[in-house]
């Protein structure tokens, strides 16, 4: 049965207009984005199938074009739509973070980092540079690569903070393997960085570890020096 044959109150677009986007399931939201299904499969059916295949909305929206194209009805057009949605979401979160007082709004920081880093396939490290009011000045990528390649030089982070006239900073990196638990190397690096930053009167406020499902804060774990 096509969506046009559904009762009007159950059609995703009509349901959104009547009840708001929050009332829709992941599959219904995705169906609106897909617009059409395939032969014998409505847009909602296709959305449910894709969500089951990829395991989550985040993994589906972050899939590479080659992987998407393996599924009937998907291809470069869908990849482009998903990339646009991801980037719009990232920019909205960045705007909210820019306007917020970071320490009083840790959930916004966590949401931004999960959206920014959670679906990365390799380890990526970033720095969030803050002013005296703990508002965001800039986000800078520090490194990108495998764990073996992902050596961050402390002096480069110190120089970055000074170049941006930051009063404090937050660092974050993702664990592509899925576990947010800090390693001993993560803990030791954080201690050395905090010590180095203190020499130039810049505070290291927190270190976050990000996965697709969760965000771990060193400060909340009591691991900040």
From Swiss-Prot:
Pfam families: RadC (PF04002), UPF0758_N (PF20582). The lineage of its organism: Bacteria, Pseudomonadati, Pseudomonadota, Betaproteobacteria, Neisseriales. A motif (JAMM motif) lies at residues 173-186. Gene3D superfamilies: Cytidine Deaminase, domain 2. Keywords: Hydrolase, Metal-binding, Metalloprotease, Protease, Zinc. Belongs to the UPF0758 family. This is UPF0758 protein NMB1038. Zn(2+) binds at residues 173, 175, 186. GO terms for biological process: proteolysis. Residues 102-224 form the MPN domain. Transmembrane segments: none annotated. CDD domains: MPN_DUF2466. InterPro entries: MPN, RadC_JAB, RuvA_2-like, UPF0758, UPF0758_N. One of its GO terms (molecular function) is metallopeptidase activity.
